[in-house]
Amino acid sequence: MKITVPATSANIGPGFDSVGVAVSKYLTIEVLEPADVWFIEHDLGDIPSDENNLLISTALQVKSDLQPHKLVMTSDIPLARGLGSSSSVIVAGIELANQLADLKLSDDDKLDIATKIEGHPDNVAPAIFGNLVVASYVDEHVNSIVTEFPECAFVAFIPSYELKTSESRGALPSDLSYKDAVAASSIANVAIAALFAGDLVKAGRAIQGDMFHERYRQKLVKEFATIKELSGQYGAYATYLSGAGPTVMTLTPNDQAEALKTAIDGLGLDGETLILSVDKGGVVVD
């Protein structure tokens, strides 16, 4: 059995802690034979290979008496870069328990569990459903809507350094004035409505008008302003911080993606530029 979970790009500007899209980088878990103890074969560096791994600890939160197995974990989702690496593992852990214990969890069940573990739905929801997901988590209740993302390319600049979510959250203010909250909410409303309507020009304008988090976090990602300015010269719809950063994501017409990638590479920044697409499948079991 093989479990595959996509990477995710959350927030998308003003959709803070609420909006995310699944993209074409993947975590794969291959389930091998039963064993006396859990063992995960991987080449992902200094992460546990036993039940202390987030994958297994998540699965055991769902079903505490699972039969241990040998597993193989592979992933091309970079760690601590704002592409949902931990969320993909949480979703995979829930699916692992679902399959091994035949729990018959619905996607909504999985989202409820994942959100309680993660604390917000913006990454775990698209990892489960695929596509674009808008979700809320209030009073321990998750409400979500899934739709297709308008046709475009995602040009991701992934810096060589990590940025922990806790550090990125530390840059945020403790509150907003009522006036700013109303303005920020109206911008988010337009961004979501435009994405649902397929109008990437208006969506892009609203995405770049975010008032919730990007203005505070940009100083932690020194490449952001340079890439945003350059992307505008190539007709991009919007540039935003993916999740908590440091990945800088640009939405661009498909026919401009390669040219923009080449231009970003030409800046000589310390990192990698990739062209990604929307993943429409979410978590998949083969």
From Swiss-Prot:
Catalysis performed (reactions): L-homoserine + ATP = O-phospho-L-homoserine + ADP + H(+)
One of the record's GO cellular component terms: cytoplasm
Name of one Pfam family that matches: GHMP_kinases_N
Entry's transmembrane regions: none
Pathway: Amino-acid biosynthesis; L-threonine biosynthesis; L-threonine from L-aspartate: step 4/5
EC number in record: 2.7.1.39
Keywords: Amino-acid biosynthesis, ATP-binding, Cytoplasm, Kinase, Nucleotide-binding, Threonine biosynthesis, Transferase
GO biological process, one term: threonine biosynthetic process
GO molecular function annotation: ATP binding; homoserine kinase activity
Stored Gene3D superfamilies: 3.30.230.10, GHMP kinase, C-terminal domain (3.30.70.890)
Chain residues that bind ATP: P78, L79, A80, R81, G82, L83, G84, S85, S86, S87, S88
Compartments where located: Cytoplasm
Role of this protein: Catalyzes the ATP-dependent phosphorylation of L-homoserine to L-homoserine phosphate.
NCBIfam families linked to this entry: thrB
Assigned protein family: Belongs to the GHMP kinase family. Homoserine kinase subfamily.
Annotated PANTHER family: HOMOSERINE KINASE, HOMOSERINE/4-DIPHOSPHOCYTIDYL-2-C-METHYL-D-ERYTHRITOL KINASE
Matching HAMAP family: Homoser_kinase
Protein name, UniProt field: Homoserine kinase
Organism: Streptococcus thermophilus (strain ATCC BAA-491 / LMD-9)
